[in-house]
């Protein structure tokens, strides 16, 4: 497989995420292909740094200077850097990649090469658990949210943004298919390759189209879960007081594309339009 497939950076999400609202305050709270930065969606003229925006929003939900933070999906450490810069007293980073934390080290930061589905970390130790553009890669969403809840202190805040969701127009994350919505849901592997050949799609950033398609269809990198499964997995967390558990995003005009019409033969529109799942909650006990 491709040498950097599992190092999924966050920059691709700039093209797919809607501008978020002001963060909700929870009750009781004070693979080996790196997707590249894409242009703003049609109708947007300004590029938003969603990573920085969401770390800032999450930090405002706690007393960050006296808070311990766990970043789930820390990658090489940039999200951890953001929380250190915001003044967090301690930041731990969790990821499955060998290079976890390679780009940022700090005396207040520790990294763990583990999956959020099951860790050996101590329970009830974090004031804030932050996950951005990560849960769509986690096979067992329920196990991931359950583990986050276990690791939170009572009164601690969970802030999770999963995007783009698999069933959304570009849930495969590959920019070379931009303008060809839901190609990954309409066709199987051979069909995608045939469609790419017919439409002059050759791959991206030095990776040929065969490697790109094999990567985006690999369950090791994408969980292929429906948007409803995120809502259900979050709602089943009995120790969390939930401020937000919702779906947003999606451009309904994409359904007018021939691929949009084709995907509607298999899915309802409400199953394929949502791009983002947001979970913001406080641990009650």
Predicted regions and their residues:
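A C-terminal cap/extension of S-adenosyl-L-methionine-dependent methyltransferases
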Residues: 3-4, 107, 210-211, 216-285
